Every structure is written in structure tokens, then in C-alpha cells.
């Protein structure tokens, strides 16, 4: 995947609030790296654009030779659901569904049968050590369990890229460490590209490559 000269700004009164200022980035197959920066640096906005959750004001975005910015919103939604997974600081699980049903959602949105979706979801919950929590609703799960369910949901369609935005930011230090270990295990076993956005220097420096962002630009 490649982002070229990405600019993003928002109207603010009589002026513009510039968030990203000509950022370029390549994501290679199976690569893992962290994007490190303080709050407001622009790192989450970049992740949202790379993940096609938002569009830039200017720039180019390609994946496997396809011009993602030329796609319609419906085309992008289908592409995103099949090729990308997302984990956020907050789990965003649906309270009316149990853990198994939450993990099944991307498969059902993608048109897969209930049988196939259930098989995939059960396999991932077992991998996450949550097979015995499959029937529990979000209000019956701990913070670490909620995040592991969210990670399973992000992986259920076997994406090529996993984007994670402050995935340990809402967890205590012990649980955070366990989730960090899980990400590295997933990267190796599932052979996916992993992009982590964080302000946690300790977490970031565990990656072989770290990009530092400040004021919407890369720091040299």
C-alpha cells in the first residue's frame, strides 16, 4: 500500500486547521511498524486515511495497483471489509450481541453464510483464549477480554493489513503488555502487515521500524 503527499485540513471559522502536511508512507506485505507521536500530531488522521475511513484534501492512495481515491464509497466499503482490519482504543462492540456474534459481523456484512461466519469467529475466539466467553455480552467481559474480542473481529476476514489506533491506551499496564504480546504473535502467525498508532514510547520501540510524527509531518 502506498500513500503519496497526503494533505488533510478542516475548516475552522475563517481559516483552515491543517492536520497532515504532505505525508507519504509505504506499507509492504508482512511489514510491522509503529507511528509514534503526541496527541494532535496527525497520526490517527493518517491511519484513518490509509484505512479509507476518511479522504484527504490532496494526495494519492494506492493498494495493489488500485487507485483507492477513485473508488466510490460503496466500493471502498467492500474493499475495506475484505482487505483491512481495524482495532481502536475503545472496543466499539455492540452491546446487544454476544462475543461470538460481534466477531461474526464483518463476515455477515461481506455476504458470508452464518455457518461460515460462525466457524471463523469460533476459531479466532479460541485462538484468543476466549472460547469459554463466546456467549458473554460486552458488559460481562473485562477490558482485556473486550479488546481481544475486538481484535478477533478485525481479523475474522483474514485482512492483509491490520491498523490499530492506540489499542492499549484504555488498558492498565499489565493488560496492555498482554495485548502487545498478542499483536506480535498475530503478526507472525497470520503473516499480515501491522500498523500501530501510539503515543507509548515503550510499545513503539518494540517494533523494528518507528515513524515519528509531529505537527502533521514526519520527524527526521
Swiss-Prot record:
What is the official name of this protein in its record? Lipoprotein-releasing system ATP-binding protein LolD
State which gene encodes it.
Answer: lolD
Give all residue intervals belonging to the ABC transporter domain. 1-220
- Taxonomic source organism: Bdellovibrio bacteriovorus (strain ATCC 15356 / DSM 50701 / NCIMB 9529 / HD100)
Note whether Nucleotide-binding occurs among the keywords. yes
Q: Where in the cell is it found?
A: Cell inner membrane
- List the SMART domains: AAA
**PANTHER family associated with the record:** ABC TRANSPORTER ABCH.1, IMPORT ATP-BINDING PROTEIN
Q: What does the function comment of this entry state? A: Part of the ABC transporter complex LolCDE involved in the translocation of mature outer membrane-directed lipoproteins, from the inner membrane to the periplasmic chaperone, LolA. Responsible for the formation of the LolA-lipoprotein complex in an ATP-dependent manner.
Q: Which family does it belong to?
A: Belongs to the ABC transporter superfamily. Lipoprotein translocase (TC 3.A.1.125) family.
Keyword field: ATP-binding, Cell inner membrane, Cell membrane, Membrane, Nucleotide-binding, Translocase, Transport
What residues does ATP bind to? 37-44
Q: What is its EC number?
A: 7.6.2.-
The GO terms this record gives for MF are: ATP binding; ATP hydrolysis activity; transmembrane transporter activity
Subunit-structure text: The complex is composed of two ATP-binding proteins (LolD) and two transmembrane proteins (LolC and LolE).
Amino acid at each position: 500500500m502506498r500513500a503519496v503527499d497526503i494533505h488533510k485540513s478542516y475548516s475552522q471559522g475563517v481559516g483552515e486547521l491543517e492536520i497532515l502536511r504532505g505525508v507519504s508512507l509505504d506499507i509492504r506485505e508482512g511489514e510491522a511498524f509503529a507511528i509514534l507521536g503526541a496527541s494532535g500530531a496527525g497520526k490517527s488522521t493518517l491511519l484513518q486515511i490509509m484505512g479509507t475511513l476518511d479522504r484527504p484534501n490532496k494526495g494519492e492512495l494506492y493498494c495493489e495497483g488500485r487507485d483507492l481515491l477513485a473508488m466510490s464509497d460503496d466500493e471502498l466499503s467492500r474493499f475495506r471489509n475484505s482487505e483491512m482490519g481495524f482495532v481502536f482504543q475503545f472496543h466499539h462492540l455492540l452491546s446487544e450481541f454476544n462475543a461470538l456474534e460481534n466477531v461474526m459481523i464483518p463476515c455477515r456484512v461481506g455476504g458470508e453464510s452464518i455457518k461460515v461466519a460462525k466457524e471463523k469467529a469460533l476459531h479466532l475466539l479460541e485462538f484468543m483464549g476466549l472460547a469459554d466467553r463466546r456467549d458473554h455480552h460486552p458488559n460481562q467481559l473485562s477490558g482485556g477480554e473486550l479488546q481481544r474480542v475486538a481484535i478477533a473481529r478485525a481479523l475474522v476476514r483474514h485482512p492483509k493489513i491490520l491498523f490499530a489506533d492506540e489499542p492499549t491506551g484504555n488498558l492498565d499496564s499489565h493488560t496492555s503488555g498482554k495485548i502487545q504480546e498478542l499483536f506480535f504473535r498475530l503478526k507472525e502467525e497470520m503473516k499480515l502487515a501491522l500498523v500501530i498508532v501510539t503515543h507509548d514510547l515503550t510499545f513503539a520501540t518494540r517494533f523494528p521500524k518507528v515513524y515519528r510524527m509531529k505537527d502533521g509531518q514526519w520527524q527526521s
